[in-house]
């Protein structure tokens, strides 16, 4: 099974479970959790089921395209089930069968590992899923998002697509993966990995990025004053990526780091609070009448 066949199989499986199938969000982010289909929709009492692939940029993890399993940009397959069903683990194990992994033939373990994303004020209780000794998935039950308590238990399943594919295709380097039957992962992404690593570690202009952070922050706050949740959140994501790039460059000191994280978190909280307030004013339209 090549990389894109694996994605298609997961999309088909989870759409059959009632998930709407979305596309990646078109702004840089470090994880699928930061996509508004998770970050915002996890809040409030309305049900939400969604799945999507999310290219996730983590500048500090870049290795110039030379490391077989550390990447500037990797791909996550994100599933959100709100409310979380009682059989969520069984649903997950069934999904593995769809990509050729029979749980009865492998050592699959759920290892306790609570999760936190400080920049967006989110945390949850959860587990890493280990397949024959390799982490392939993160399970999380959100407790807070945007520093707001989650009203309805939300289950998040985040598959690490590259790791899963390396296991399925039995290769030791991500760059040897078959993207389809003709093109390898390396042919698609190796040059971008080198160039993005060169940029993050050596060539990015720190002064410019500090300035951009201030501009993005100012614009996010201005838009929130006008009640524009989505455009404001876009600028929160831009702030987060600018911060991550500065952090990878080594341009942010220890005391500065806490300050920048706090600034992003405060913006994210304001966006989250406004989103919930607006949904409430709309009468939480996704709720059935009996649940309101």
Swiss-Prot record:
Q: Where in the cell is it found?
A: Cytoplasm
GO BP annotations, alphabetical order: glycyl-tRNA aminoacylation
Matching entries from SUPFAM superfamilies are given as: Class II aaRS and biotin synthetases
* Gene Ontology MF terms: ATP binding; catalytic activity, acting on a protein; glycine-tRNA ligase activity; transferase activity
Q: Would the keyword Nucleotide-binding be found if you checked this record's keyword annotation?
A: yes
Superkingdom of this protein's organism = Bacteria
**Main EC class the enzyme belongs to:** ligase
Q: Which NCBIfam families match?
A: glyQ, PRK09348.1
Pfam families tied to this protein: tRNA-synt_2e
Q: Per its UniProt record, what InterPro entries does this chain match? A: aa-tRNA-synth_II/BPL/LPL, Gly-tRNA-synth_heterodimer, Gly-tRNA_ligase_asu
Listed EC numbers? 6.1.1.14
Could you name the Gene Ontology cellular component terms for this entry?
Answer: cytosol
Spell out the subunit comment: Tetramer of two alpha and two beta subunits.
Record's catalysed reaction(s): tRNA(Gly) + glycine + ATP = glycyl-tRNA(Gly) + AMP + diphosphate
Q: Which keywords accompany this UniProt record?
A: Aminoacyl-tRNA synthetase, ATP-binding, Cytoplasm, Ligase, Nucleotide-binding, Protein biosynthesis
**Keyword Nucleotide-binding recorded:** yes
Family the entry assigns: Belongs to the class-II aminoacyl-tRNA synthetase family.
Protein name stated in the entry = Glycine--tRNA ligase alpha subunit
